[in-house]
Regions:
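Active-site neighborhoods and metal-handling regions in enzymes and metal-associated proteins
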Residues: 49, 53, 57-343
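Residue-level detector of structural "landmarks"
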Residues: 13, 18-21, 27
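N-terminal start and proteolytic maturation junction detector
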Residues: 8, 28-30, 62-63
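Intrinsic low-complexity, disordered N-terminal segments enriched in polar/charged/small residues
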Residues: 2-6
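Short linear motifs in low-complexity or flexible loops
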Residues: 23-24, 34
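Cationic, low-complexity basic patches in intrinsically disordered or flexible, solvent-exposed regions
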Residues: 27, 31, 38-41, 47
């Protein structure tokens, strides 16, 4: 499940804000150097600490122009200061492996059920029952978020069809048609650890464009993963993903990003799917995060629908996404959510 990117607008361009939210005055006193929320203005555009929200990544989007905050649905409920999600003990590694294996098994199970005429709500129910009854896991998206006028996510999986970029809500009214491209995004909690992964499916016979977009998007994900090792930078990963997508005349959605993950669903760092080589956070052994590029067949511009969750392409052209959860190892990486077909 993607994290919405935290950005600050400073003319003439967009910049990533290293803070996920603006700390309160009380928090700032405990952590000198952070910016403070005061009467809806940043006191200083200086960021010394990385903050994260353990509740809802959509609640922590702040955009500023000339210091002023422009946003919707802000509702800070629970915050914690941490630099990055890390898997530091053998118990943590085993926990993440088990959670990742469970998440992958849901995608392996659901494939045969993706057929024309099936509703996305039916797919959700099949996945929910499998996650809860067969895997003894918790579906992390169910009732996730909420507050500040935004409803909690009402289903156990995300089903994003055709021009839906991400966070599509399963519905009994959404019946798959022949040729539909569908991303199913799964996040499970097993013994306190999260496994987060997604895959593209097709209902019936898909178009050549849909198949090509899905293939290139999966390649983008792997090109990013292949660069993961201690000493690499997140900008290297983003650049590799962006370069491959644009070389194939596709575009990268920039409003959503990968995220740190372990015992917290959405944690630091923010893993951008675009960027410049040699920039960004330096990877260290034990860091765990997702890489989950969203690639559009048309322009990268998106909008959020009135349900406050579903993101769609503005030009209504196709979008695709693939996702894995992985960890930085001593000499490379380990993917926790590999499926049988990938091994």
């Amino acid at each position: 499940m993607s994290r919405i990117l935290t950005v600050i607008f400073l003319s003439p361009g967009w910049f990533v804000c290293p803070n996920s939210h603006v700390p309160t005055s009380e928090q700032a006193q405990k952590h000198p150097g952070t910016c403070v929320e005061s009467d809806k203005f940043f006191n200083r555009l200086q960021f010394s600490y990385t903050a994260s929200c353990a509740v809802n990544h959509r609640d922590i989007t702040y955009m500023a122009r000339r210091g002023a905050i422009y946003t919707t649905n802000i509702f800070l409920k629970e915050t914690s200061f941490r630099m990055v999600a890390k898997v530091e003990t053998e118990i943590d590694i085993l926990g993440m492996r088990e959670a990742g294996k469970c998440a992958a098994s849901v995608l392996e199970m659901i494939g045969e059920h993706v057929q024309p005429g099936v509703t996305t709500d039916h797919l959700n129910q099949i996945c929910h029952d499998f996650i809860v009854n067969e895997l003894d896991c918790i579906p992390a998206p169910l009732n996730y978020g909420g507050g500040g006028g935004q409803m909690p996510f009402p289903k156990s999986i995300c089903t994003s069809v055709n021009h839906v970029v991400c966070h599509g809500i399963p519905s009994p009214a959404k019946k798959l048609k022949n040729g539909d491209a569908l991303n199913i995004d799964i996040t499970v909690i097993k013994n306190g650890y999260h496994g987060d992964t997604s895959k593209m499916f097709f209902a019936g016979e898909a178009s050549i464009l849909a198949k090509r977009l899905s293939k290139i998007t999966q390649e983008c994900m792997y090109k990013g993963i292949e660069l993961v090792k201690p000493g690499a930078r997140l900008g290297d990963i983003g650049y590799a993903i962006q370069s491959h997508a644009e070389a194939n005349r596709f575009s990268v959605v920039r409003e959503f990003c990968g995220h740190g993950i372990a015992k917290v669903f959405h944690d630091e760092p923010q893993v951008l799917h675009y960027g410049r080589p040699g920039t960004g956070v330096v990877l260290e052994e034990g860091m765990s995060f997702t890489i989950e590029p969203i690639i559009n067949a048309g322009k990268r511009n998106i909008k959020i629908l009135p349900d406050q969750w579903t993101a769609v392409t503005k030009d209504h052209k196709l979008s695709a996404q693939w996702e894995h959860t992985l960890m930085v190892t001593k000499d490379g990486f380990e993917i926790f959510t590999l499926r049988q077909e990938e091994q």
